[in-house]
């Protein structure tokens, strides 16, 4: 049955969220949904600080569980990326209860660690898409609006344009996926179109990540690879001699994985939403 008001919980399993996000995101929600404004609850942990992280490992794990296991929430929205999800994922996954399976989960970058684990464990409504802190970037209102459109209505307009004609999809930051391969968290992507994006890496590192990804026997069973945007590329000295698309094509050819072109995803506010598996109707 359609709910009149969606309830969204925001958590930060990696790095600390900027305080102003908690004011600006609800303002966007009110402007987009004046008659059925989603309730957006920022867990206090989002503003905690413990060195690099938004609270220590136990605090971050418990915050995720507080929202995920609470049946009153419809969605879990990652506050931001950064780093730290790998330190809490195993503690989280073994304590999730039945209400957690009825929620939507959305984020990208470091959040890919938890998204992968959820998808591997059979969670059906998981997506690579904007985080709450994207509101602070140029064009952030549009990114937040896109995430809300997916969480509230499963809007097809929020999706990466090719998703609607593909049977199975998944998307990751390539460094995050590379580091998941060979661990108990590696998801089964057999038959999926795999979309990859990157930020802040030199070309040789992109090359190395794609070597590792495309060398994995299970990844070689994907339906194909699409490359999103690779932004903030660090200069290579000497010049690497290939751009990111040439590198991706090279490793696809060497590994026998079909190259399927470019994807409209990236570490930016134009980042479109890619559901894991099939796109799902609104809860």
Each model region followed by its residue ranges:
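ATP/NTP phosphate-donor binding region
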Residues: 1-72
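Charged helix-capping and loop-helix junction motifs
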Residues: 25, 56-61, 208-213, 239-247
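Short Gly/Thr/Asp-enriched flexible loops that form oxyanion-binding sites at enzyme active sites
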Residues: 81-100, 119
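Short, acidic/small-residue loops that bind anionic groups at enzyme active sites
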Residues: 94-117, 125-131, 254, 258-260
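Glycine-rich, charge-decorated loop segments at or immediately adjacent to ligand/cofactor-binding or catalytic sites
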Residues: 112-123, 268-275
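Conserved anion/nucleotide-ligand pocket segment
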Residues: 123-182
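Internal helical hairpin/lid segments
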Residues: 188-237
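ATP/nucleoside-binding phosphotransfer catalytic cores, i.e., glycine-rich phosphate-binding loops
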Residues: 229-283
